[in-house]
Amino acid sequence: MKVCKFGGTSVGTVERMKHVATLIKDATPKIVVLSATAGTTNHLEEIAANLFNREIEQAHDRITRLEFQFIEFANGLLTDEKLKREAIDYILDRFQQLWKFTKDSFTSVEEKEVLAQGELISTALMHFYLRELKVPNVLLCAFDFMRIGPDNEPDLEYIEQKLREQLACHPGINLFITQGFICKNAYNETDNLKRGGSDYTASLIGTALQADEIQIWTDIDGMHNNDPREVSGTRPVKRLSFNEAEQLAFYGAKILHPFCIAPARLRNIPVRLLNSMEPSAEGTLISNLQDDNIIKAIAAKDHIIYIKFESNHNLCPYLFISKIFDIFAKYRTPLCLLVSSNLDVSVAIDDCTRLSNIISELRQYAHVLVEDRMTIVSVVGNMQWEYAGFEAKIMEALKDIPLRMISYGSSNNDVAFVIKNTDKKRAL
């Protein structure tokens, strides 16, 4: 069994959805996870914002336009009139849910129901098209097996049990279509795995079923050794370890959701990154194997805030560091990077939601310096401390760029540093 995930751009037009169908219709047992078609989630977020603010006229206009787009998509995708009618009826039924919200109260629970419609419609359209091609397939609803617990973490035991029950109901079927991103929560309410969550869905399904391989299909041929939007002449990296891939995803490689590696690593399931526009390309294989290439790839994470805490000596050193951790934990703000000395601590964060609260409390114990518009650049590879010389190469390459912070040693797989956003392109 393979699990294959296709993102929004891969199914974003009629032609691309038809192309994906050619990639999945063979007899190999597989579960196919689809995102909403490209741009749909953005439209649904705008509709949800209108509904939340009771901007009903704007919501009406956006719902009407999106409904028309999907009906046109179905008309272009399907030629069989009976299947076309079924598909359009399904679309109209899903949009009835949206129209209902223009009359009723609207909360964060209803917002998640709005956002779920994109994946529900894209998977239904693929299901109908495969039926037109006479390809046996079953449309599974992710709400029937994908669940997060009270801590908002996936309930893997529940997912495995319910998913196996679903598959057992369809003996002889090799192709299943389901939604990425969407799920139920511990209270049986509609919820989701946040932006980019379709990768996470595929990884959770692959882990639950102990799949042979998890394939993430995008519109680029694997993980590149640098950001192709910033640097010309990049090339795909053929092999990465789980840890290397996780570091690259966390530090800005957009091709992969950072959370999707941990479930695959749990059961040692390889993850392959492939290009739906060029399916013959080798892509990138992510596994538990670590090769000897010291430096593999570079990634950058924008919108970083750098904070330096200089102790005012109200607390002894170990209590000072403990207090910093306690206050960041209190406000549920994760640290992207941290370096410390006896009396100074520097951190980099990407979530400034509670920054004013954090600074207000820590000013009792430290002089605080805050700098925004920063970027973390991470150099990733097999960086065992015994391999001398690679640190010098990195520093030599950056000798003309001011480094605000350097982190090395906490991981065997990366050296990370904080720079001004304006220096990012030159650094990469």
Predicted segment positions?
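Nucleotide/pyrophosphate-binding catalytic subdomain
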Residues: 1-256, 261, 413, 419-420
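Hydrophobic beta-strand scaffold residues
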Residues: 137, 176-177, 271, 335, ...
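A conserved active-site cap/scaffold subdomain adjacent to cofactor or substrate pockets
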Residues: 241-313
